[in-house]
UniProtKB/Swiss-Prot annotation:
GO terms for biological process: endoplasmic reticulum to Golgi vesicle-mediated transport; protein geranylgeranylation. PFTA repeats lie at residues 44-78, 88-122, 124-158, 159-193, 207-241, 363-397. Signal peptide: none annotated. SUPFAM superfamilies: L domain-like, Protein prenylyltransferase, Rab geranylgeranyltransferase alpha-subunit, insert domain. This is Geranylgeranyl transferase type-2 subunit alpha. Gene3D superfamilies: Protein prenylyltransferase, Rab geranylgeranyltransferase alpha-subunit, insert domain, Ribonuclease Inhibitor. LRR repeats lie at residues 442-463, 464-486, 487-508, 509-530, 534-555. It is an enzyme of class 2 (transferase). The gene is Rabggta. It catalyses: geranylgeranyl diphosphate + L-cysteinyl-[protein] = S-geranylgeranyl-L-cysteinyl-[protein] + diphosphate. The modification Phosphoserine is found at residue 98.
Amino acid sequence: MHGRLKVKTSEEQAEAKRLEREQKLKLYQSATQAVFQKRQAGELDESVLELTSQILGANPDFATLWNCRREVLQHLETEKSPEESAALVKAELGFLESCLRVNPKSYGTWHHRCWLLSRLPEPNWARELELCARFLEADERNFHCWDYRRFVAAQAAVAPAEELAFTDSLITRNFSNYSSWHYRSCLLPQLHPQPDSGPQGRLPENVLLKELELVQNAFFTDPNDQSAWFYHRWLLGRAEPHDVLCCVHVSREEACLSVCFSRPLTVGSRMGTLLLMVDEAPLSVEWRTPDGRNRPSHVWLCDLPAASLNDQLPQHTFRVIWTGSDSQKECVLLKDRPECWCRDSATDEQLFRCELSVEKSTVLQSELESCKELQELEPENKWCLLTIILLMRALDPLLYEKETLQYFSTLKAVDPMRAAYLDDLRSKFLLENSVLKMEYADVRVLHLAHKDLTVLCHLEQLLLVTHLDLSHNRLRALPPALAALRCLEVLQASDNALENVDGVANLPRLQELLLCNNRLQQSAAIQPLVSCPRLVLLNLQGNSLCQEEGIQERLAEMLPSVSSILT
């Protein structure tokens, strides 16, 4: 037995570790207590730096101790010479780097470094950029370090082109670098600003085509990595629509003027307000949303005085101006006409996608074919399938409608965990296509029956629709945005899964509402219909509430103006 190393048993090892932890805890607690006592006594000297170094060196995520260090450093600045202060800062930077090696994702350490560098008269920003490069080489997903690099680049006024080159080097080394792709999406709009475009606006076409080629190389190298696919989707995105008036509608009978915006806005806010001119004379009116709530909305209304609608003149001219962008629309109400409107002739490029040049269309068509080839090799790659769908939407949504639906079916089978999201996205695309077809046909009737819809969107585009058929879908609710349909007279929503009709409110022209075979269980669910003054026909057959005793009398009492209620 002599000369052989004694091996501790597991119990002895556990006991030794316990004693070691207890010893460390005692030291930790005593050092912390000493720091707090000195802080309370106002003893902001270098001994506090030494004590906090012992603790933060092992646990950099003690925010209160970083605050203590800042207080001490600020105090010592007033007592030491410039040379001594510089030495103190140099030592602090070295200590921070050692803390980052303990925990490269320490909030407190990176924040303290920002604070320290901000106080220096001439920081060495080049050294800080090199520090970031080292830590990102160790862990390219360290978003704390990415945040710090953006701070350094901003303080040092590093040109966006240099930072873009830095992302090039990281992406070239490893395509699976979401942070680099994201940083790239922030830098490119700065490098190539476009007129009338926001910070996430579109890129010049030559830049866009180059980026598409780069990202295609990435996802063909590793088809299962999502980073490049997300960046590709950003490239295919479109800029935020400008704040413009899409439509103005005047109803003589309701004595009401309705306007529709390209996106939800608040009238009367810092963004702008609406000015109304009637026969070239300004008219002061109160603007409101269809539901009466003062919040951003696509549609805004105002009541018109009788004088602006009288028949003594052959016509009345209504001009609405949005001060936020000087957008305006004008329509003329002729004598004996019940309504008038003005709306731009919309195309799919204007409504739902960007206009494509011949060159860009050629590139995207080539990408589509390449993705189809990749999908044959990787038939269960969900990112590839989704990108094929998005490319088809970007190229021609109506031409590829049938093929897009087939790819949706394949994608749902491949990615069943996201079936609900895919159903909603499919519904969105189908509704967009239906709106486009309605625009091209120049009609005010929209048929959306038997389309397996799960959600409704773009309802602001339907302000002029008089008949809407939503029957035989999978809708569980009708959204409040339905109030945008100011001209709607007939709504068919039978054979869905509606549990309430909260969205069917404040529709001034609604006359017929068909709700057969839904999931309406109580008469209280019908209460919102009280706000539809012209409703005369309500069909509730096939709903559970029809089994309630005395339901007919209860509904007649609730809706006295509805002459025909079918249960």
